Amino acid sequence: MTDSEYMDRAEAALAAIEQGCDRINDATDADIDNQRVGGMITISFKNGSQLIVNLQKPLQEIWLAARSGGYHYRYDGKAWVDTKTGEEFFGNLSREASLQAGQPLEFAAA
């Protein structure tokens, strides 16, 4: 994948996260906050915990930092998948956000 293709796909993923936060806030009382600075989004929860998603352009990866640990994702032609487990990024983001928010939250690719 070229750097340009990576950036297009990665930017689409970040936009989907931002849209997901807005949708979740409209549909639930989760009251999550998201702040984007360049290629990084910080998602903050009422309990003070955070998820951090950032782009790693040199590696063509997306990284997720959560209470449970750090995760690295590469695009496999269809989806962003964990480099160790093969799990899909938005499924993992949903699981980690749900754990940290204390209620079911769902993120999806745009």
Swiss-Prot record:
A Pfam match: Frataxin_Cyay
Superkingdom per UniProt: Bacteria
UniProt GO cellular component terms: cytosol
Disulfide partners: none
GO BP term, example: iron-sulfur cluster assembly
Alphabetical UniProt keywords: Iron, Metal-binding
PANTHER family assigned to the protein according to its UniProt record, in alphabetical order: FRATAXIN, FRATAXIN, MITOCHONDRIAL
Function: Involved in iron-sulfur (Fe-S) cluster assembly. May act as a regulator of Fe-S biogenesis.
Family: Belongs to the frataxin family.
Protein name: Iron-sulfur cluster assembly protein CyaY
Source species of the chain: Variovorax paradoxus (strain S110)
